[in-house]
């Protein structure tokens, strides 16, 4: 007889998840849908993250990255019953970078770049899932997005914590 707990990450099993993102200064959120494969899982979703950057004046430039993404994470190690799993992988993303979304900079501030820009890039990630009950897992991980088109910062980092629910 097959133990049901080992089937939680079987190929074809779908899930939804929600994560909080943090880079030790700013915050964001991510939501995704995915499906397990024999060696890991693929996912698609949307993410938004607030950032800020110092300027030559006393003000900080706030900006937001909003994007959709697609990824594949490969299972690196797991427990026998797959109640704890570690994944590594990456993905691609595209969306928008919005500068000063709350219009907090003085009106006479010249940025030298547009207020919105197309954003695209790739990212690498490491993720661990800890099943607390049969169909619910706590997720913890780290992401390093490389933005090819950002006018502010090319390389970012995020740590994430969230919940994953099996469908």
Each model region followed by its residue ranges:
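Gram-negative (and chloroplast) outer-membrane scaffold detector with strong preference
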Residues: 32-107, 132, 136, 165-167
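Transmembrane beta-strand segments that form the barrel wall of outer-membrane beta-barrel proteins
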Residues: 10-24, 29, 41-52, 138-148
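Cleavable N-terminal export/targeting peptides
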Residues: 1-11
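Acidic, glycine-rich flexible loop segments
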Residues: 119-126, 130, 140
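Outer-membrane beta-barrel domain signature
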Residues: 47-48, 53-54, 97-98, 102-104, ...
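Transmembrane beta-barrel architecture of outer-membrane proteins
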Residues: 13-15, 26-28, 65-69, 119-123, ...
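Outer-membrane beta-barrel "beta-signal"
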Residues: 155-167
């Amino acid at each position: 007889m097959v133990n049901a707990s080992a089937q939680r990450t079987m190929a074809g099993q779908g899930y939804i998840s929600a994560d909080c993102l943090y880079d030790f200064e700013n915050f964001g959120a991510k939501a995704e849908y995915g499906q397990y494969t024999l060696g890991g899982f693929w996912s698609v979703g949307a993410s938004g993250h607030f950032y800020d950057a110092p300027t030559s004046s006393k003000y900080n430039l706030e900006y937001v990255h909003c994007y959709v993404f697609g990824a594949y994470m490969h299972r690196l190690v797991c427990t026998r019953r797959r109640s704890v799993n570690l994944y590594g992988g990456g993905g691609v993303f595209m969306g928008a970078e919005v500068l000063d979304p709350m219009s907090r900079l003085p009106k006479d501030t010249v940025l030298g770049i547009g207020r919105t820009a197309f954003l695209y890039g790739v990212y690498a990630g490491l993720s661990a899932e800890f099943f607390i009950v049969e169909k619910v897992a706590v997720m913890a991980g780290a992401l390093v997005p490389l933005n090819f088109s950002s006018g502010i910062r090319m390389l970012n980092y995020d740590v994430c914590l969230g919940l994953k629910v099996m469908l």
